[in-house]
Amino acid sequence: MCYSEGRVGWIGRMLAMGQTPRKCDAIFVLAGARKRKVYGLQLYGEGFAPRILLSVGRFEIRRFRELPLPYPAGVTPINLLAAAQPIPPPERHFFVACDGGGVSFERVPAGRLGTLREIRALANWCGQRPEVQSLVIVSSRFHLRRVRMCCRAVLPKELRMTYAASPEEGTAANGGKDEPRTRTLALEFLKLAVYRVVLLRFRVPGMMAG
């Protein structure tokens, strides 16, 4: 598929979004690039929330131990790699929660459409914790629009959302005309269209954002 430079620029501007982080009850970081989790943990360390929930996909599990999780003194780090071994590879997905009491993890139910799967699991997690009334959602700036679409369709309208973009993964030396970035934007644009159709069967509760 061929996209002109002008069209790619328009797609990028249309997709990109991000809000200033603010104090909340929990931070949720979607699976994907490592910088998302580093940024989320930075916000957690700066006191933006008393807890953080990290979504860890199958391709992140092996290197997850490299993240600077806030383990209490004397606590043995969790071993996601061992926990994942008996699980079929396509179903290896975990939520890792960190708060003042320590670090724990749970398996994310299998399902299609990764981002929607994560937000539905987040809805279940929040439903078990009624004290969570506000969230900062962390992902890449081009992914957040699709994330917001899922949140509006799945999460309770009472939850107050802030969508924070993680730092850029890097800028192209040729001004952003590189083929990988073009393909990434084009694919995200197509995914957004697919999700719009899929989410028509969900009730959209008009969540608050901003």
Model region roles, listed by residue range:
Residues 2-179:
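A structural signal for short, hydrophobic/glycine-enriched beta-strand patches
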Residues 65-67, 206-210:
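Amphipathic, soluble alpha/beta structural segments
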Residues 177-208:
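A transmembrane-helix-recognition feature enriched in membrane-embedded lipid enzymes
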